[in-house]
Amino acid sequence: LFQMDNYTDTIMLFEAAAMGEQNPLTAMMTATAYNVDNFETMASDLAVYCERTIPLSTGAQKAVQLVPFSYARYWHGYLIWLRPLLCVMSITGVRVVQYLVLFALLAVILWQLRRQCGLRAMVWFAVSQLAVTVFWVPHQVQYFTTFCIAYAGCAWVLARPRRAGQLSIALVVLGTCTAFCDLLVTPIITLGLPVAVWLCCLPQRAASGARQCLPVIGGSLCWGAGYAMCWGLKWVLATLITGRSEEH
């Protein structure tokens, strides 16, 4: 994560600030927001978007014509928690909350790894997260969303020994949650991290190569099925409810 995904975060913030006269169901399906051409002017663009006016040098206000854009192919599940938080705090406060949540989950995972898999597994997991600069993840809403889902999956896997069938069911849920919340930026992390920590557990380490590979392949297919079904369902519902088959 050596580059901040400000463009995607800008889209998320504009979706959170979206205003319109559509009924809630149609608004959820269309996910209409203001079209952003330059994420570097996000602060001023958000002010214009919310006020729908531009201040003039004379002190008067000039009405602006907003250009709508629909992100109808995504569920935008992150709005379930982002909108309420933005009602009571600024984006800086949201980032503080994200830091607290993510590093609390990381602490739980490291403790579970130490207990279930040993000190070496815990250290290498911590090193891997530092290698991807996890300390910057909560600074971005987009990265936080997928890392939070992935860490929650890791915590569930490590809570007690899990059979391959249980892992596959969990990966269906993780794939569905990822499609519901993610904007197709870092989805695969919600598959890779839970599977990696599952393989670190003692029963899997003692298994033969085939007994390790087959659950991973099957679990990956389950994750993909959950992701595809959730994402495809949004396309179908958005088309049926809005009468449009593409974003605009």
What residues fall within each predicted segment?
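Membrane-interface micro-motifs in multi-pass membrane enzymes
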Residues: W75, V127-Q166, F180-P187
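Transmembrane-lumen/periplasm boundary regions of multi-pass, lipid-linked membrane glycan transferases
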Residues: A225-R244
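Conserved small/polar residues in nucleotide/adenosyl-binding loops
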Residues: H248
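Juxtamembrane segments of multi-pass membrane glycosylation machinery
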Residues: R73, I80-Q98
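Perimembrane helix-loop-helix junctions
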Residues: G153-L158, I189-L221
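Membrane-interface alpha helices of multi-pass inner-membrane proteins
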Residues: L167-P194, P215-C230
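Transmembrane-helix motifs of polytopic, lipid-linked glycan transferases
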Residues: Y99-V123
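Interfacial juxtamembrane loops and adjacent helix segments
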Residues: F2-Y71
